[in-house]
C-alpha cells in the first residue's frame, strides 16, 4: 500500500506576531529510512519519496535550509548522538558519554568497526576533524551551534573529549543535528554532489532540483530499511500527489495543501500530526517603516490568523497566538498576544505617521507562501498599507537575498529552528 504522509502540512503563521502550526507526521531526520528498526530482509525493497523542498546542492556546510539535511542526515551522514521522536538524546556513533561535574567536559566513547562510504575508518580523529571543520570552515549560519566549543581532543581511536568554553544546555542536542554530521578529511572534495558519510546509503546520482538517488552501501554497521531510495522533487504538492496516485512515487511528505487529503484514492494511507515548524512573517526592523515598533504591531493586529487557518489550512493549523513558538515546544504558552483588531492596527499606523506606508512582501516561490501572501495583501491593504508582492526563487534567490543578505522589508517562510530539524522530518 502506498503511503501519503503529510510530513509538513500546515505551519504556524507566526508573525513577529503569528498564526498556526503545521500538520505532519513525526519521524527521525527523514522519511526515507529508519536504520534502527529495519529487518534483515527489508533491504531488498526500493522506495521513491516525493518532496517539494528541492535541494540544489548537497553541501549543507555552505548552503542553508532544511532540504539537504532532510535527505542526507541518518541516510548518508550520521552523528555521535541521535534525537529520537520524543526529543530525547540517544546513542548514535557514540555508544555512551560522560559529562564532567562542571558541565564543560564531554567524553564520548565511539562505536567500533564503523567505516565511511569511501572505506576510511571512523575514529575519534575523524570526529575531532568534523567538529573543528564546523568551527573553522562552515559558512552556513547554523555553524554557530559549535561556538561553545573550546577544544576537541582524540585521546585514543575510540575516545573523544570535548571541552566547552562554558556550560551549554543546547550543545549536546546540536550534536544530533546537521552540525554534528561526521565527515572524513578524504571526503571533502565534492560535498555538493558526492558526500561521504558513515550512514547506510551513498549518493549514486544527483540532479539538482530534480532528484537524489541513494543506494545501500557495503560495509554499513547497521541494517538499512531499503535497498534503493529515490527522492524526487516536484514543483508543488498537487503534482506530487498526482504522482502518488498514478503509482510514480511511494510516499509524499511535506504536504502543504491539506485539502488534498480528501481526494486521495482508497488504499493510500494518510498520516497527519503536529510538527515543530511554523510559518513566520518576518519584518525587517532595520528598514523603514518597520524600524518603528508601532508599525510592526499594526501588522500583527491586521492579520486575521483564524481566517488564514480556515482559508489556507482547512482549520487544521494551531494558532500560536502571535508568538513564533510551536505548541510542541516545552516553553509554549497558549496565549494570544495580538488578537485580530484592524481598528487598533489603523490607530497604531496613525500614531506612527505611517498611514499609506509602502511595503514590499517578498515571498519564496513555494505554493503555500504564494497563497499566504495573497491573503496578507488583502488584510494589510485593508488597514492602510500599500503592499507590493514580490517573488524570490526558492531556495537559490530567497536564501541568499532574504535569509543571507537581509535584503527585504517583509517576508514569510515555513520555518523550523535548527535544533528542531532532527525531530521534524
Where are the model-predicted features located?
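Aromatic- and charge-enriched surface segment that lines or borders ligand/interaction sites
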Residues: 95-139, 155, 161, 289
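Gly/Pro-rich hinge or "lid" segments in bacterial periplasmic/extracellular proteins
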Residues: 167, 175-224, 228
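Ligand-site clamp/hinge motif
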Residues: 217-262, 386
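Periplasmic-binding protein-like
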Residues: 262, 286-328, 371-372
Amino acid at each position: 500500500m502506498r503511503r501519503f504522509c503529510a510530513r509538513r502540512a500546515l505551519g504556524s503563521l507566526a508573525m513577529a506576531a503569528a498564526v498556526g502550526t503545521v500538520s505532519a507526521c513525526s519521524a527521525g531526520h527523514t522519511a526515507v529510512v529508519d536504520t534502527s528498526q529495519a529487518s534483515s530482509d527489508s533491504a531488498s525493497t526500493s522506495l521513491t519519496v516525493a518532496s517539494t523542498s528541492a535541494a540544489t546542492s548537497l553541501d549543507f556546510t555552505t548552503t542553508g535550509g532544511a532540504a539537504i539535511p532532510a535527505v542526507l542526515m541518518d541516510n548518508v551522514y550520521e552523528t555521535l548522538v541521535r534525537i529520537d521522536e520524543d526529543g530525547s538524546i540517544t546513542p548514535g556513533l557514540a555508544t555512551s558519554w560522560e559529562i564532567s561535574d562542571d558541565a564543560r567536559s564531554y567524553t564520548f566513547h565511539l562505536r567500533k568497526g564503523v567505516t565511511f562510504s569511501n572505506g576510511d575508518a571512523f575514529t575519534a580523529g575523524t570526529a575531532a576533524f568534523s567538529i573543528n571543520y564546523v568551527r573553522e570552515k562552515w559558512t552556513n549560519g547554523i555553524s554557530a551551534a559549535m561556538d561553545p566549543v573550546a577544544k576537541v581532543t582524540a585521546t585514543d581511536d575510540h575516545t573523544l573529549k570535548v571541552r566547552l568554553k562554558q556550560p551549554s544546555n543546547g550543545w549536546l542536542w546540536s550534536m544530533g543535528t546537521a552540525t554534528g554530521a561526521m565527515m572524513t578529511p578524504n571526503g571533502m572534495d565534492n560535498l555538493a554532489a558526492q558526500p561521504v558519510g558513515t550512514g547506510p546509503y551513498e549518493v549514486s546520482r544527483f540532479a539538482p532540483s530534480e532528484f537524489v538517488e541513494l543506494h545501500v552501501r557495503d560495509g554499513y554497521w547497521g541494517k538499512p530499511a531499503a535497498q534503493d531510495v529515490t527522492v524526487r522533487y516536484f514543483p508543488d504538492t498537487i503534482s506530487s500527489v498526482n504522482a502518488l496516485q498514478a503509482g510514480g512515487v511511494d510516499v509524499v511528505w511535506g504536504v502543504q495543501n491539506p485539502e488534498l487529503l480528501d481526494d486521495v484514492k482508497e488504499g493510500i494511507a494518510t498520516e497527519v500530526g503536529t510538527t515543530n515548524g511554523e510559518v513566520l512573517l518576518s519584518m525587517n526592523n532595520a528598514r523603514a517603516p518597520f524600524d518603528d515598533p508601532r508599525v510592526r504591531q499594526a501588522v500583527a493586529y491586521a492579520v486575521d490568523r483564524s481566517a488564514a487557518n480556515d482559508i489556507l489550512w482547512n482549520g487544521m493549523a494551531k494558532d500560536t497566538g502571535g508568538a513564533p513558538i510551536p505548541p510542541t515546544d516545552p516553553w509554549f504558552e497558549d496565549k494570544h498576544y495580538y488578537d485580530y483588531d484592524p481598528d487598533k492596527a489603523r490607530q497604531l499606523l496613525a500614531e506612527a505617521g505611517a498611514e499609506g506606508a509602502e511595503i514590499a512582501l517578498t515571498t519564496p516561490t513555494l505554493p503555500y507562501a504564494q497563497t499566504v501572501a495573497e491573503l496578507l495583501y488583502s488584510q494589510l491593504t485593508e488597514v492602510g498599507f500599500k503592499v507590493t508582492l514580490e517573488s524570490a526563487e526558492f531556495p537559490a534567490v530567497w536564501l541568499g537575498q532574504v535569509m543571507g543578505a537581509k535584503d527585504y522589508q517583509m517576508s514569510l517562510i515555513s520555518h523550523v529552528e535548527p535544533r528542531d530539524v532532527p525531530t521534524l522530518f
